[in-house]
């Protein structure tokens, strides 16, 4: 049963005082058993976006379907962040009493290779996939819910008509109410099935672009650069590929069960689908407050609680992990400092341990206050790409990454972003993410290399990080999926 929470008078009073181009939310509520099942019911042939947030954003999750607008930027065009700003420009939101952080907004992803527009980088890595630098869609309505949730959840469906698109505020209200009711009904009553994947195969083996030995060579090359003083730490990755034998919706449905993560997302976009279990926040902006949450330091999960505790103690006591984490926190402090008011940058949470299904991580929180005149675009440019998935110093380390990795990263270590129409934004770092492109799943996994890194240990860390994604495809297929690169020679 749907209930309309925004009355006509409240809406028209807000609209009367608002800027003509402003959007005013109309809220409808509906109870559902599971938000992702509701998304499956509501999505159509155009796909949609689902952001399963269990951390950040005060514990809110969102989904959107039927985008009102879409933009894509080719890498050869340049100006990616400016194009994103242009896409968001002109949007205003008058929220009134609506406390949903994002009642409407835009969702998109930025390629790691946007870094080539921010720094002068070589073109050593092969651009073997014709992927864009940006895909972003605008949603005039969202379904939102608060985490954690019980056995059932109340979806708060908000439609945000633009006042000047209608002859009167009353007409805008009626449109918004109907628009919200349509999504609420679809979420409660639609067909949750998805179309079959385009690939029909009994094989879903992930194969790497390098062997254990060639990955070790990458690590040794980076260690030589460290000895030469070019870098202190660098994130080195390998790319895994498998036929796209399961639909992204099915893969995400399994992934959210086997490895729930605070910045997970499913993006179904033209030509590219992202299935992400990212645990890492690149940037959150709310008013003038900005923050980032660097992750540096990893251990596998133990088989028992006692083993877990021993591994956590080992992680906290490890001098290599301690030094690497401190260095990267300092890097993020410096990045935020580029756009923050003097003296406002601080570390509010240092070296906590977060546990996930396959691994545990060291995490810190760095905060600042955006200086007067600095924009969201400035803030993104200051922190992008994240220091934890490049290294320190960042520009030189990105040059080294481009040299040692065989192919361009694409979405990996780029960002998935949720952008509000009031300047609010939340961007993750694209790690632990399946990318479906050209009937294949691509999965990149990396490890931070420092002066005393052991190549075999770093290689194993990449496998540990990729395991949850492989398990999700395994569960979706209902059979064993091999991580074949473990045995490659």
Curated annotation (Swiss-Prot):
Subunit structure: Tetramer of two components I and two components II.
Protein's pathway: Amino-acid biosynthesis; L-tryptophan biosynthesis; L-tryptophan from chorismate: step 1/5
Chain positions recorded as L-tryptophan binding sites: 262-264
Family of this protein: Belongs to the anthranilate synthase component I family.
Regions of compositional bias (Basic and acidic residues) in chain numbering: 300-309
Organism: Haloarcula marismortui (strain ATCC 43049 / DSM 3752 / JCM 8966 / VKM B-1809)
Single GO biological process annotation from the record: L-tryptophan biosynthetic process
Official protein name in the record: Anthranilate synthase component 1 1
Binding-site list for Mg(2+): 324, 461
Essential cofactor(s): Mg(2+)
NCBIfam families in UniProt: PabB-clade2 (TIGR01824)
Cofactor note: Binds 1 Mg(2+) ion per subunit.
Keywords from the UniProt entry: Amino-acid biosynthesis, Aromatic amino acid biosynthesis, Lyase, Magnesium, Metal-binding, Tryptophan biosynthesis
Catalytic activity from the UniProt record: chorismate + L-glutamine = anthranilate + pyruvate + L-glutamate + H(+)
């Amino acid at each position: 049963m749907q209930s309309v929470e925004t009355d006509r008078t409240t809406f028209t009073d807000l609209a009367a005082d608002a800027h003509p181009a402003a959007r005013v939310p109309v809220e409808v509520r509906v109870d559902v058993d599971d938000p992702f099942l509701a998304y499956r019911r509501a999505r159509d042939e155009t796909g949609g976006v689902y952001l399963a947030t269990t951390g950040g954003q005060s514990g809110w999750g969102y989904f959107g379907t039927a985008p009102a607008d879409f933009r894509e930027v080719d890498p050869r065009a340049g100006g990616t962040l400016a194009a994103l700003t242009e896409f968001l420009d002109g949007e205003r939101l008058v929220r009134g009493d609506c406390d949903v952080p994002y009642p409407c907004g835009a969702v998109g992803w930025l390629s790691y290779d946007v870094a080539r527009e921010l720094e002068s980088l070589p073109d050593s890595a092969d651009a073997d996939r014709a992927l864009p630098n940006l895909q972003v869609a605008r949603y005039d309505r969202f379904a939102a819910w608060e985490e954690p949730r019980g056995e059932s959840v109340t979806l708060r469906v908000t439609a945000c008509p633009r006042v000047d698109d209608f002859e009167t505020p009353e007409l805008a209200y009626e449109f918004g109410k109907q628009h919200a009711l349509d999504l609420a009904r679809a979420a409660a009553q639609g067909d949750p099935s998805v179309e079959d994947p385009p690939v029909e195969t009994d094989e879903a083996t992930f194969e790497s672009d390098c062997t254990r030995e060639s990955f070790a060579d990458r690590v040794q090359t980076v260690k030589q650069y460290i000895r030469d003083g070019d870098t202190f730490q660098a994130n080195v990755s390998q790319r895994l590929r498998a036929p796209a034998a399961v639909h992204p919706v099915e893969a995400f449905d399994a992934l959210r069960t086997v490895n729930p993560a605070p910045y997970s997302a499913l993006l179904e976009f033209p030509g590219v689908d992202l299935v992400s279990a990212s645990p890492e926040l690149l940037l959150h902006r709310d008013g003038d407050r900005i923050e980032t949450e660097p992750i540096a330091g990893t251990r596998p999960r133990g088989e028992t609680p006692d083993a877990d505790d021993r591994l956590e103690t080992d992680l906290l006591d490890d001098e290599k992990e301690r030094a690497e984490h401190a260095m990267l926190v300092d890097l993020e402090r410096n990045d935020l400092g580029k756009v923050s008011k003097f003296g406002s940058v601080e570390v509010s949470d240092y070296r906590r341990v977060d546990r996930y299904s396959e691994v545990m991580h060291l995490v810190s929180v760095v905060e600042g206050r955006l200086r007067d005149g600095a924009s969201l675009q400035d803030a993104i440019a200051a922190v992008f790409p994240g220091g934890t998935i490049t290294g320190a110093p960042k520009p030189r380390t990105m040059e080294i990454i481009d040299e040692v990795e065989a192919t361009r990263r694409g979405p990996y270590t780029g960002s998935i972003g949720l952008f509000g129409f009031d300047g609010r934004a939340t961007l993750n770092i694209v790690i632990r993410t399946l990318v479906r492109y050209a009937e294949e799943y691509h999965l990149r996994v990396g490890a931070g290399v420092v002066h005393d890194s052991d190549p075999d240990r770093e290689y194993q860390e990449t496998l540990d990080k990729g395991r949850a994604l492989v398990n999700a495809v395994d569960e979706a297929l209902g059979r064993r999926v091999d991580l074949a690169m473990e045995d490659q020679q």
